[in-house]
Amino acid sequence: ESGMGKTHLLKAAKNYIESNFFDLKVSYMSGDEFARKAVDILQKTHKEIEQFKNEVCQNDVLIIDDVQFLSYKEKTNEIFFTIFNNFIENDKQLFFSSDKSPELLNGFDNRLITRFNMGLSIAIQKLDNKTATAIIKKEIKNQNIKSEVTSEAINFISNYYSDDVRKIKGSVSRLNFWSQQNPEEKIITIEIISDLFRDIPTSKLGILNVKKIKEVVSEKYGISVNAIDGKARSKSIVTARHIAMFLTKEILNHTLAQIGEEF
């Protein structure tokens, strides 16, 4: 799936190899970039095609992101297959990412699928709330946001964007822009965040009611709806309960009296 962090992971692998193995030559490109280069070189002479293959094979590590973009391109696949074999025969490293597992990839020669399956395949799971929160905090630091962002505000962002790394980074960029425009605000609260992202909740949650809000919040925090409705005072449950109550007020415009009855 898009936004799961595949590109980030491959770039991290590239940076790690280059930082720790100085003698290794690494080539990183997207599947689309490789396909465009192959299509261009196929218009040229046989000698130039072989030269292109040799140039790629001079690398010790080849990393291709979104390899599915090479599907249904017969001539491009032939070039790719030759390069793939060369790396295997010379005991070199190959890293690929795709939007599905090898056996589900269509538009590739069976020989390539077999070779894909020879390697180690790892499915990247959707982010959990803890990981999403860690990414948000790191991105806030990377973007050098001066204002303090409260934990409730961070949880609010995590609740809506924990399924997409790109959206997480985009949301922090939006927050950064707002912070630069409002330097007098030293603390960014959940109230500020909810106003800043007021265009999100309806499309994200669909038909809204208190039950739906409780279900979404409880799922994100890994607790039951009964826990939100109960009297337990553990930190995670209290935070989830407060988030659900706040969303009920902000999204459904319920009064405090109504919220008291519903929680």
UniProtKB/Swiss-Prot annotation:
Location in or out of the cell: Cytoplasm
Cellular component, GO, one term: cytoplasm
GO BP annotations, alphabetical order: DNA replication initiation; regulation of DNA replication
Listed CDD domains: AAA, Bac_DnaA_C
Annotated region described as Domain III, AAA+ region, given as residue ranges: 1-179
Region (Domain II): 1
Entry keyword Transport: no
Residue numbers binding ATP: 3, 5-7
Source domain of life: Bacteria
A GO term for molecular function: DNA replication origin binding
Keyword Cytoplasm assigned: yes
Family indicated by similarity: Belongs to the DnaA family.
Function field: Plays an essential role in the initiation and regulation of chromosomal replication. ATP-DnaA binds to the origin of replication (oriC) to initiate formation of the DNA replication initiation complex once per cell cycle. Binds the DnaA box (a 9 base pair repeat at the origin) and separates the double-stranded (ds)DNA. Forms a right-handed helical filament on oriC DNA; dsDNA binds to the exterior of the filament while single-stranded (ss)DNA is stabiized in the filament's interior.
Protein name: Chromosomal replication initiator protein DnaA
Source species of the chain: Mycoplasma mycoides
Chain's gene name: dnaA
